[in-house]
A protein has these predicted regions:
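Short, flexible hinge/linker loops that cap or flank conserved catalytic cores
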Residues: 1-2, 103
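N-terminal beta1-alpha1 ligand-phosphate binding loop
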Residues: 2-34
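Short hydrophobic segments within beta-strands
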Residues: 10-11, 40, 112
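Short glycine-/acidic-enriched loop or helix-start segments at secondary-structure transitions
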Residues: 19-21, 49, 84-86
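N-terminal beta-loop-helix "entrance" segment that forms/cooperates
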Residues: 39-59
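Helix-loop-strand module that forms the ligand-binding subsite of alpha/beta enzymes
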Residues: 56-117
Length: 117
């Protein structure tokens, strides 16, 4: 049997009733049989600190390892003040550091979002 395509997904909202978390759950149900999608909760990733980038907290190590192991990345995020939420930017910064060890290198990344408006 061929290896399934691995998709790592995460959301850009901390809100319990997040529309974007619901969007990820819906996307997970629509994943084709030749793929699998894991949703990673980035809420516990601490503020990026460059002094710790060579030995980051365990959750950052786990996040980076999952990104590196995935074939593709899916991010569902709301728009806050014409941009992405700060904690999502923080998670992306944490996974792309230190220089030369960017977990996203070579990964296709898709963004999607949902809102009531």
């Amino acid at each position: 049997m061929d290896k399934k395509i691995s998709i790592l997904a995460f959301g850009g909202s901390l809100r319990k009733g997040s529309y974007n978390k619901a969007l990820l759950r819906a996307a997970q149900e629509m994943v084709p049989k030749d793929a699998q999608m894991e949703v990673f909760d980035i809420a516990g990733i601490p503020a990026f600190n460059q002094d710790l980038e060579n030995n980051p907290p365990q959750i950052v190590k786990e996040f980076k390892a999952k990104i590196k192991a995935a074939d593709a990345i899916l991010i569902a995020t709301p728009e806050y003040n014409y941009s992405i939420p700060g904690f999502l930017k923080n998670a992306i910064d944490s996974a792309s550091r230190p220089y030369g060890d960017n977990a996203f290198d070579g990964k296709p990344v898709a963004f999607m979002g949902a809102s009531i408006g």
